[in-house]
């Protein structure tokens, strides 16, 4: 059995536990996903199951993409692979639903963070900025020295500087499943998950969770 499914982030709300405690949750529409390809060690060098999510019209896909999905019986926008040692448990065309998850289970959620554009070091890296007084000007949000006068006197790779922020793959680990609503393909997890509403996310069984 593969370890995860694809879905989209719906948004956040809150629910109450039996003691009346408020729990912030993110609602994720998970699946249904369709198995589109089986990767084998003999043919591909590794074993994995490729699944697809979100049906689209034929004109939204190229002819090669349509041909690739012919065996699955559905045209799907998003394709992702999950490594597994039990490819015999799946075949092309199988439908996977949110019922593979259960309340109380721990999951990891992978998404793409919101893009913030070009940002300075204070917002991007949390720098404190320069002095606000004693004759300083235009130094409030400056990064300060980036290495001049040190040994060696050059700029090191990965020095934290201004640049594009966000729009990167982010994984949030060990979120607790609060509820599962199979008839609506909904998964409620405690806390926040990366990305904007309606953004594509990948939900998998927690790697580090108990």
Curated annotation (Swiss-Prot):
Pfam families: Ribosomal_L3. One of its GO terms (biological process) is translation. InterPro entries: Ribosomal_uL3, Ribosomal_uL3_bac/org-type, Ribosomal_uL3_CS, Transl_B-barrel_sf. One of its GO terms (molecular function) is rRNA binding. It comes from the Bacteria. Residues 125-151 are annotated as: Disordered. Keywords: Ribonucleoprotein, Ribosomal protein, RNA-binding, rRNA-binding. Gene3D superfamilies: 3.30.160.810, Translation factors. One of its GO terms (cellular component) is cytosolic large ribosomal subunit. One of the primary rRNA binding proteins, it binds directly near the 3'-end of the 23S rRNA, where it nucleates assembly of the 50S subunit. Part of the 50S ribosomal subunit. Forms a cluster with proteins L14 and L19. Belongs to the universal ribosomal protein uL3 family. This is Large ribosomal subunit protein uL3.
